[in-house]
Amino acid sequence: MAALAPLPPLPAQFKSIQHHLRTAQEHDKRDPVVAYYCRLYAMQTGMKIDSKTPECRKFLSKLMDQLEALKKQLGDNEAITQEIVGCAHLENYALKMFLYADNEDRAGRFHKNMIKSFYTASLLIDVITVFGELTDENVKHRKYARWKATYIHNCLKNGETPQAGPVGIEEDNDVEENEDAGAASLPTQPTQPSSSSTYDPSNMPSGNYTGIQIPPGAHAPANTPAEVPHSTGVASNTIQPTPQTIPAIDPALFNTISQGDIRLTPEDFARAQKYCKYAGSALQYEDVSTAVQNLQKALKLLTTGRE
């Protein structure tokens, strides 16, 4: 992909989107679709923050130029031309990164790349809002991932051993008010990231969450979008591929509907189509478990009229 024109220095007003822009830059070659939507989120958020002052207008104008250039380069990519495909692509990518970090956490393998994966997953869930309101599950995953990144980072920084997996803790509303935490580590004019690029969440709020249901770590896909961890001084950073767990098929889904009174609404068809798109996107990452789950949801909706 051709290099994009550099952005001017980031205005102070846009501090809350600087990590989303860094994530975009890191994915320009790894996954241009993710890079595009990260910039789109930054553009939409920046417009809401300040679109009038000269420095902000200049920055947003250059960011718009990058978006247009990316859109032209991606051409007829369905993830760009069709929102439902783009949303599925982004959700599956964020979930894949979340599950990688969660799997490492549950296995007691604490390292900087795992911390970054948790935090990046939370940023990508922010980006999903360009398609509309987040699901309750995504909201919970975002909170949990952001808290986990903070908790593990602080433990390692203080020479303590983090507690693996979900822990029972109290809710802290400060996290909602500080979702741009850790931004101080990102330069106002982002540099081209290297393969060992990391982030510093030292200013991220400390908060605890309870009642959040996180998928079992064993379901983390073998192939993840995260980078290979680098040496961090913490023992056992080697990632071992995890066998995929394919959910059991509900036999009831194969029962023939004989009543003939199932009335599907246009919304039902749209939701079924969305699940099928999600499944297709998951298969691009060889994530069989997620693909099967979404196909089951579509089949149940089409055969029962219910989710």
From Swiss-Prot:
Residues 160-233 are annotated as: Disordered. It is a peripheral membrane protein. Pfam families: Vta1, Vta1_C. Its main location: cytoplasm. Coiled coil: none annotated. GO terms for biological process: late endosome to vacuole transport via multivesicular body sorting pathway; protein transport. Residues 2-186 are annotated as: Interaction with IST1. It is found in: Cytoplasm; Endosome membrane. Involved in the endosomal multivesicular bodies (MVB) pathway. MVBs contain intraluminal vesicles (ILVs) that are generated by invagination and scission from the limiting membrane of the endosome and mostly are delivered to lysosomes enabling degradation of membrane proteins, such as stimulated growth factor receptors, lysosomal enzymes and lipids. Thought to be a cofactor of VPS4A/B, which catalyzes disassembles membrane-associated ESCRT-III assemblies. Involved in the sorting and down-regulation of EGFR. Belongs to the VTA1 family. This is Vacuolar protein sorting-associated protein VTA1 homolog. The lineage of its organism: Eukaryota, Metazoa, Chordata, Craniata, Vertebrata. The gene is VTA1.
